[in-house]
A protein has these predicted regions:
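N-terminal leader/targeting and accessory segments in enzymes
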Residues: 1-97, 101
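Phosphate-binding loop of NTP-binding sites
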Residues: 67, 76-197
Length: 198
């Protein structure tokens, strides 16, 4: 799903950390008012208002009427396997991530994705540095710091080096041009629900 397709639907953003807030700002800038969902609920509304420049209610997952949502964009910290998320899908809601949407829109670009259990940040940083020393313009984004949604509206660069956590990769349907797997070991099993899912 592209950003334009997302903006044509009723959107909920689950998780108001860095990635969720960046997506909320992007949607608001395009005239879309998302439903915000977070396990902390209304208590984070003042911080959210300051971060996105608009007063929006923040609902607890149990407060969301899934019939009023077409697409749920989950933040990386929200497990793909949570019962509330499974219930949303059963109600017909499409579940995706900001990373998946961005990759749909930037599939034509030179994207180097770095993932793995350990070593992602180091590898992504080294790759970006090597590319910059070759005279290429580089954006180093993703799990390493700046959310990928911050890239919308910016001038293009030669190479996008993207650190991708297993949480972010779960709903990705478009493959980057190059993907580096640094290592693979049993980790984050509480989030994934077991070794097979991880």
């Amino acid at each position: 799903m592209t950003l334009d397709q997302l903006c044509a639907r009723r959107v909920a953003v689950w998780g108001v950390g860095a990635e969720g807030l960046a997506l909320a700002r992007l949607l608001l800038g395009r005239g879309v008012v998302p439903t915000l969902v977070d396990d902390r609920g209304h208590q984070v509304e003042p911080a959210v208002a300051a971060a996105v420049g608009a007063e929006l209610p923040v609902l607890l997952p149990a407060e969301v009427g899934w019939a009023s949502v077409d697409v749920l964009v989950r933040s990386p910290g929200v497990s793909r396997y949570r019962p509330e998320l499974v219930a949303a899908e059963a109600a017909g809601v499409t579940v995706t991530t900001a990373m998946a949407v961005w990759l749909e829109d930037f599939h034509h670009a030179a994207v180097l994705a770095v993932t793995g259990t350990k070593g992602k940040s180091t590898t992504a940083s080294l790759a970006a540095s090597i590319l910059e020393h070759q005279g290429r313009s580089v954006a180093l984004v993703g799990n390493i710091g700046e959310p990928v949604t911050e890239l919308y509206g910016r001038p293009p660069v030669d190479v996008y080096v993207v650190e991708v956590s297993s949480y972010q990769a779960t709903d990705v349907t478009v493959s980057p041009r190059v993907c580096v797997l640094t290592s693979l070991a049993p980790d984050h099993l509480d989030w994934h629900g077991g070794v097979d899912a991880y």
